[in-house]
Amino acid sequence: MAAKDVVFGDSARAKMVEGVNILANAVKVTLGPKGRNVVLERSFGGPTVTKDGVSVAKEIELKDKLQNMGAQMVKEVASKTSDNAGDGTTTATVLAQSIVREGMKYVASGMNPMDLKRGIDKAVAAAIEELRKISKPCTTNKEIAQVGAISANSDTSIGDRIAEAMDKVGKEGVITVEDGKSLQDELDVVEGMQFDRGYLSPYFINNPDKQVAVLDNPFVLLHDKKVSNIRDLLPVLEQVAKAGRPLLIIAEDVEGEALATLVVNNIRGILKTVAVKAPGFGDRRKAMLEDIAILTGGQVIAEETGLTLEKATLQELGQAKRIEVGKENTTIIDGAGEAANIEARVKQVRTQIEEATSDYDREKLQERVAKLAGGVAVIKVGAATEVEMKEKKARVEDALHATRAAVEEGIVAGGGVALIRARSAISGVKGDNADQDAGIKIVLRAMEEPLRQIVTNGGEEASVVVAAVAGGTGNYGYNAATGEYGDLVEAGVVDPTKVTRTALQNAASVAGLLLTTDAAVCELPKEDAPMPGGMPGGMGGMGMDM
């Protein structure tokens, strides 16, 4: 085990605060509509230019071990805020730096760090309660577009695209972001349920121009096992043929004789069929088959439910208005399932989301909800160069998270104004002693900092603007993009309540930990072993004639 260096008290804190300042100073220049760019070096390819706070924070690793500890703690503030709310990383970093800076002054003057932390926690709890009170629901397309635009660094086209996508697939729908092929942003919407499995044979294609198989008003057969013997399928195929409608077979696999017979029947026009593999694996496959069954009003033919292929009837088959099967995707449009059953299933999956422990499980469950509830929208980001594409894509993803947060918890006035207004609730909070009162003062000062930084980045005098905004009421604030004062909500300068709340909570949490740190343990740098001595000189010819 490597030797460790242990540093105590002020020496440890001072070094860690240096690290906090290095990271925060690099991140905070990106805040607000007039935020500056930061250029990030890449190990290969050109550098990346960004105005995204969390992207800057993630790149920073410091040489000094103690400074790096401080920087990593604030990096945690940024990434936690990004994970929970999708935006607000720069605001959280600015708040954390301010709480640490002000707190260190009080610690240096001999105050008890634990009482300071208790005071900070009391003030933050009161501020969050006030933020919830002043929050208003975000329901209209215009409000959603405004939130998206602000989060994407005042890019209105991104806000409009996200609002349009949410309008098409609903608030719960899946919206994904991909690289586009042109200079313009594009929006593709897939209605109905889509899963990533295509036809098992190209002979099922009946629309050669688009290379897809289209089934109008088909039956849907769902089976959780492999189908290789055509005799198992014959009874149900005969019933479908009599009904004169096409059939989609979704099974673990369809192979051999069964697949060959289906292809021949399809080519001869006897029975229009398409076979695809079931999506997912293991338990997830069973769950997704059940989802499709509920969506189409059918049943999964499985031994567990006492159903077999040979005895299957049309009653067990699902139905849909239209199904499109491509090489890699199958889309079920307008399934015949009952709305009440679909709603109950969505509720059930949402409960599983709340109980899920891993991000991967949660993401997959959310996809299932979206597929059941509405559809999938794909925003294709257009840009002239790859560097611009990366930067823009990161902004679109941020904006998307922010709009989801706004729909979830509502919106407040942006531009740092909500935090200024929430200070009124803290003014009435009293600590149990003078040290706790000092902790409350720390938060009061920190809550001005985001507005100060936005104004500073815009090249104006921060103290004058903060005084003017603090003298106003409600949504009155300073619009840094135009340099004017007014109602920020009317001007479209809004922040999701969840983003502001999460930023404040996470900043106070990590800053409190730093203030109450009294020792730091880090590895000593390894000393390189000296190089071994060189080989002795040669023995020469020893006077021998050759």
Curated annotation (Swiss-Prot):
Q: What class of enzyme is it?
A: isomerase
> Where located?
Cytoplasm
Task: Give the record's family classification.
Answer: Belongs to the chaperonin (HSP60) family.
* One Gene Ontology cellular component: cytoplasm
In which broad location class does this protein mainly occur, judging by the first location in its UniProt entry?
A: cytoplasm
Role description? Together with its co-chaperonin GroES, plays an essential role in assisting protein folding. The GroEL-GroES system forms a nano-cage that allows encapsulation of the non-native substrate proteins and provides a physical environment optimized to promote and accelerate protein folding.
| Pfam annotation, one family | Cpn60_TCP1
Decide whether keyword Oxidoreductase is in the record: no
Output compositional bias ranges, type Gly residues.
534-546
| Keywords (A to Z) from UniProt | ATP-binding, Chaperone, Cytoplasm, Isomerase, Nucleotide-binding
Origin organism is Paraburkholderia phymatum (strain DSM 17167 / CIP 108236 / LMG 21445 / STM815) (Burkholderia phymatum)
Q: Which GO annotations describe the biological process of this protein? A: protein refolding
The protein's name: Chaperonin GroEL
Q: How does it assemble?
A: Forms a cylinder of 14 subunits composed of two heptameric rings stacked back-to-back. Interacts with the co-chaperonin GroES.
Region annotation (Disordered) maps to 526-546
InterPro entries per UniProt: Chaperonin_Cpn60_CS, Cpn60/GroEL, Cpn60/GroEL/TCP-1, GroEL-like_apical_dom_sf, GROEL-like_equatorial_sf, TCP-1-like_intermed_sf
Is Cytoplasm there in the keyword field? yes
A GO MF annotation of the entry reads:
ATP-dependent protein folding chaperone
What broad taxonomic lineage does this protein's source fall under?
A: Bacteria, Pseudomonadati, Pseudomonadota, Betaproteobacteria, Burkholderiales
PROSITE patterns tied to this protein: CHAPERONINS_CPN60 (PS00296)
Residues that, per the record, bind ATP: 30-33, 51, 87-91, 415, 479-481, 495
